[in-house]
Amino acid sequence: MSDSFLEELRALIDVDDGVGTRARYSSDAGLTRIPPLAVAFPRTQEQALAAFDLARARGVPLTARGGGTSCASNAIGPGLVLDFSRHMNRVLHIDPDARTATVEPGCVGSTLQAAAAAHGLRFGPDPSSQNRATIGGMVANNACGPHATAWGRTSDN
């Protein structure tokens, strides 16, 4: 099944199932190692959704990944890993009046902080990994940081 799945996936999105890539993506900041079947690199929301749909239809486990900074092995899995940090990593819009930001899931926390600061705003969470941790991962883990009592966790922002 994996060969036909990968063939279908390659028609939709950039995929790497090489030994080196699978080894690099077999761990995050945690101690567990689980080699994935393959790693895909979506460039658009449509590509990500197409990969999600195909994985679901074929029963292939899917793990979304950003910076791989989770100490709890949340960024690894045995099926398809979607790495959002390579291409989907931008701050798309800051609305200072509404105090909101629209970002792609692979946007690094410190990148959002810098963009928000230009408008006199900040994104509350400041984990020690904020120069590598992505917003998608911060949302998934409800990240916080040393100033959480003042500025809140991700779910508070």
What are these regions, as identified by a protein language model?
Residues 1-57, 67-99, 128, 151:
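N-terminal flexible segment immediately upstream of the FAD-binding catalytic core
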Residues 62-64, 71, 112:
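Extended, hydrophobic alpha-helical segments in both membrane/secreted and soluble proteins
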Residues 42, 64, 105:
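Conserved strand-loop elements at the edges of beta-sheets that form or border functional pockets
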